[in-house]
């Protein structure tokens, strides 16, 4: 009884903190530079959230007698913990606000869904099914969830890169079209005046473009690092799962829906890494592949559970009925 109470308290404390954090981040976003202390407070709040989630996992492990990764609810808690772990690392390195924004938002939405009440029955700890009563549980599922977390963060950074690149190209195209229209519809003197004004603002646009280019490079750098790390975790998770499957079911691979989509996920990010090995890699091309991978991960991790079929059906769930 006491363990359930502690778990309930830790769950709602972590959710309350991340809800406050997202509000603080919105305030910081709209007020821009004036709220440095507010940003630092949100970072400290994420550390408290990490500690609460750690305590939640330890508590659930203690009273259930097994590592808390036996169903979707527990894996979502662990996914939130993984996001918060990734989040606090750049906090100590400083000057990585865009990365911590991605990871912080991921914690908010994951933890929000976990504690929303949409998941029924599986939020209660139960005895492991025979197939899960193995030492491979910790190795396989931990590596897979850490891989998902790293890949999702890297993919979100790639999506942010695409948005910034698209807006940059759109502004350049608009400016070129504006000058072209002026050359047709205005007299030569007015056109030269516009050109003169444009040259006067060159330093402003150059500085702005420089910082935008630096941001794109940083997003590309951290995206590739996150995806590379996640790909390693995913590979280890798939290989350990194959060994576990051979022990449990007598076959290394059964083309189960979960296994199939995990393999598709691995292929997508293998393609991403391949695009990074070319002599002159283009950020946008690899970012497009990573964006596709973002959708594939959610299909693999979450969408397949909606089916409730296959050898991994014990991870399925039901939504709260009206």
Swiss-Prot record:
GO terms for molecular function: heme binding. Its main location: plastid. It is found in: Plastid, Chloroplast thylakoid membrane. Keywords: Chloroplast, Cytochrome c-type biogenesis, Membrane, Plastid, Thylakoid, Transmembrane, Transmembrane helix. The chain crosses the membrane at residues 15-35, 45-65, 72-92, 98-120, 144-164, 226-246, 253-273, 287-307. It is a multi-pass membrane protein. InterPro entries: Cyt_c_assembly, Cyt_c_biogenesis_CcsA, Cyt_c_biogenesis_CcsA/CcmC. This is Cytochrome c biogenesis protein CcsA. The lineage of its organism: Eukaryota, Viridiplantae, Streptophyta, Embryophyta, Tracheophyta.
């Amino acid at each position: 009884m006491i363990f359930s109470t502690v778990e309930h308290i830790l769950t709602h404390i972590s959710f309350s903190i991340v809800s406050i954090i997202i509000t603080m981040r919105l305030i910081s976003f709209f007020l821009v530079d004036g709220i440095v202390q507010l940003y630092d407070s949100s970072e400290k709040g994420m550390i408290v959230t990490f500690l609460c989630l750690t305590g939640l996992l330890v508590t659930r492990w203690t009273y259930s007698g097994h590592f808390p990764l036996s169903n979707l609810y527990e894996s979502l808690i662990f996914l939130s913990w993984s996001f918060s772990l990734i989040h606090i690392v750049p906090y100590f390195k400083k000057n990585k606000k865009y990365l911590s924004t991605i990871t912080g938002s991921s914690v908010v939405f994951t933890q929000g869904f976990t504690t929303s009440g949409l998941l029924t029955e599986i939020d209660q700890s139960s005895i492991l099914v025979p197939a899960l009563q193995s030492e491979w549980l910790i190795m396989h599922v931990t590596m897979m969830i850490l891989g998902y977390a790293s890949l999702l963060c890297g993919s979100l950074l790639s999506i942010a890169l695409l948005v910034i690149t698209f807006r940059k190209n759109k502004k350049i195209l608009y400016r070129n079209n504006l000058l072209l229209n002026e050359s047709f519809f205005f007299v030569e003197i007015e056109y030269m005046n516009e050109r003169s004004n444009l040259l006067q603002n060159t330093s402003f646009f150059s500085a702005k473009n420089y910082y935008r280019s630096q941001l794109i490079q940083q997003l590309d750098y951290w995206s590739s690092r996150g995806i590379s790390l996640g790909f390693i975790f995913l590979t280890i998770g798939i290989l350990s799962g194959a060994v576990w499957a051979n022990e449990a079911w007598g076959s290394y691979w059964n083309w189960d829906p979960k296994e199939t989509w995990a393999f598709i996920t691995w292929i997508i990010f293998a393609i991403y890494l391949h695009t990074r090995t070319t002599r002159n890699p283009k950020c946008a091309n690899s970012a497009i592949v990573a964006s596709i991978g973002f959708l594939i991960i959610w299909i693999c991790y979450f969408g397949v559970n909606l089916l409730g079929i296959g050898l991994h059906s014990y991870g399925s769930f039901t939504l709260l009925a009206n």
